[in-house]
Amino acid sequence: IKLLSMDDKGNIFYLVYGYINRGRHEGMNGIQVMKYDAKTNCNEEISFLSTSLPYDSMKEDLEKFSYLNSKSVFYCILEGDLHEIDLEKKKDKILESGLVNESLTASKDQSIIAIEKEQNLYKNKQIEMIDLESGKKQNFTTGSDKRIRAVGFLSNDFIYGEANAVNVSKSSNGTVSFPITKIHIVDINGKTIKEYQKAGRYIMSTQIKGSILEMTLGKRTGGKIQKTGT
């Protein structure tokens, strides 16, 4: 069970996920979006998302991203589908399909998400950022010879990196090399706050620690791009 919200009258929205052992979906596997009405002392099913995923996988998906906004609209990912469920109107809509593990990046409070529009990182030239409170969307694109990927969020400011397509590669063990040539930091409205690039240098990896973005730099040596330090 996962608590979503409780108002001052004691009404509660919550999730039940895994094997369902009662109600009209008894015997099925999935996620129930439920409402408890304090006045009538009744539990009502708002929506049901059926899945063959095991409990641990559902838990992992919900812990990675699930968000209830101030208008009682709930967002979650299940089997690569981004669901938008209006708890008051009892309507479920799929906003995006085919998401893979790293396709979606969320801010710390999960109120803002960024989606890489191509499943294949080698082809991705567009990122869509969505403010889940206002519903506003911002799109960031790059040229045909470039690729972009999400880096993360500093508070509610979004960071993404741009790389030359010819330098993006995947090793035999599955590790993706994405040497970034330019970092973009934008606000919730898509306005550029800061950009970082240095001639002849690449950003090999990044890590966000609190309000600090740490970058490991690299340069081309003997035909290969290699790490040189921070």
List the predicted regions and their residue ranges.
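Beta-strand-rich domains and repeat architectures in extracellular enzymes and scaffolds
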Residues: 3-18
